[in-house]
């Protein structure tokens, strides 16, 4: 096995990825597989912090589109990410991986509050840290949370684990002729509406020179491939 290309990573796992083929809730096989892949990466000495989405349980944007107050809908989405984070923590600890959950909204009975220095210390001690409840503010996505935490923790890369295996020129689940894009620069993502991440998150990554790798989570071993720098999915960053 080769040497890891990245020393500290933010792994962004979409809520939809946790649902697997069932489309809603948490697929136990999927979350166990993800946990085993994270364990494999952690054993290489890579610092791993995780941001989990909540779309398998609730999506704030959809709630607000149906007439719900946007802030309320977003807070419900943040709570959905806490559910996912606790499930992932349990899956990791069942495999012997020391894990901490930190929430952007305090709920001390079930998790630590997010404290940057404490999170860094956990990583230095070899623990996996899961960041839940987004940024703690409505109107900000979990993609933006991933970009923000990557900047705060000086991560080398954001690994975006999704249901699809990269970024396409159109929706591959609708268009069978869609083509996967190998390399993109930030401005192309910002201007092209390619659905990598929202503009706030992309701008934050661009301003702080944080590359993004978008890949599919279904195939076991993909997280390790991304860590080792193998060509996988779509790379977003500054192109030479």
Curated annotation (Swiss-Prot):
Subcellular locations according to the entry: Cytoplasm
- Can you provide one Gene Ontology molecular function annotated for this UniProt record? ATP binding
Cited Gene3D superfamilies: Acetylglutamate kinase-like (3.40.1160.10)
Q: Where does ATP bind?
A: 12-15, 55, 59, 168, 171
> Mind listing the UniProt keywords for this protein, alphabetically?
Allosteric enzyme, ATP-binding, Cytoplasm, Kinase, Nucleotide-binding, Pyrimidine biosynthesis, Transferase
Q: What is its EC number?
A: 2.7.4.22
* Annotated control of activity: Allosterically activated by GTP. Inhibited by UTP.
Record field: catalytic activity? UMP + ATP = UDP + ADP
Q: Which InterPro entries match?
A: AceGlu_kinase-like_sf, Asp/Glu/Uridylate_kinase, Uridylate_kinase, Uridylate_kinase_bac
Residue ranges of the region described as Involved in allosteric activation by GTP? 20-25
Q: Some GO term, biological process aspect, for this entry: which one?
A: 'de novo' CTP biosynthetic process
Q: What class of enzyme is it?
A: transferase
Q: Where does UMP bind?
A: 54, 74, 135-142
This entry carries the following GO cellular component terms, namely: cytoplasm
> Is Nucleotide-binding found in the keyword set?
yes
In its keyword annotation, does this UniProt entry include Iron?
A: no
The UniProt entry's coiled-coil ranges are none
* Chief location of this protein within or outside the cell: cytoplasm
Pathway field: Pyrimidine metabolism; CTP biosynthesis via de novo pathway; UDP from UMP (UMPK route): step 1/1
Q: Which domain of life is it from?
A: Bacteria
One Pfam family named in its UniProt record: AA_kinase
Q: PANTHER family, alphabetically?
A: URIDYLATE KINASE, URIDYLATE KINASE PUMPKIN, CHLOROPLASTIC
Subunit record text? Homohexamer.
Name of the protein described by the UniProt record:
Uridylate kinase
Source organism of this protein record: Moorella thermoacetica (strain ATCC 39073 / JCM 9320)
């Amino acid at each position: 096995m080769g040497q890891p290309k990245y020393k500290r990573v933010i792994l962004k796992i979409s809520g939809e990825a946790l649902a697997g083929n069932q489309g809603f809730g948490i697929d136990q096989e999927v979350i166990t597989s993800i946990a085993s892949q994270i364990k494999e990466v952690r054993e290489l000495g890579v610092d791993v912090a995780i941001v989990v989405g909540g779309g398998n349980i609730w999506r704030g944007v959809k709630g607000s589109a149906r007439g719900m107050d946007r802030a309320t809908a977003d807070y419900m989405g943040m709570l959905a990410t806490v559910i996912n984070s606790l499930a992932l923590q349990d899956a990791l600890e069942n495999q012997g991986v020391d894990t901490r959950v930190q929430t952007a909204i305090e709920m001390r009975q079930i998790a630590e509050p997010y404290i940057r220095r404490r999170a860094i210390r956990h990583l230095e001690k070899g623990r996996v840290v899961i960041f839940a409840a987004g940024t703690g503010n409505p109107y900000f996505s979990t993609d933006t949370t991933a970009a923000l935490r990557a900047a705060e923790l000086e991560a080398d890369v954001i690994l975006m684990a999704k249901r699809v295996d990269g970024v396409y020129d159109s929706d591959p689940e609708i268009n069978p002729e869609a083509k996967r894009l190998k390399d993109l620069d930030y401005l192309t993502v910002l201007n092209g509406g390619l659905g990598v991440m929202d503009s706030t998150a992309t701008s934050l990554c661009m301003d702080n020179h944080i590359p993004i790798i978008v890949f599919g989570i279904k195939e076991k071993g993909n997280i390790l491939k991304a860590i080792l720098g193998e060509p996988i999915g779509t790379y977003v960053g500054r192109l030479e």
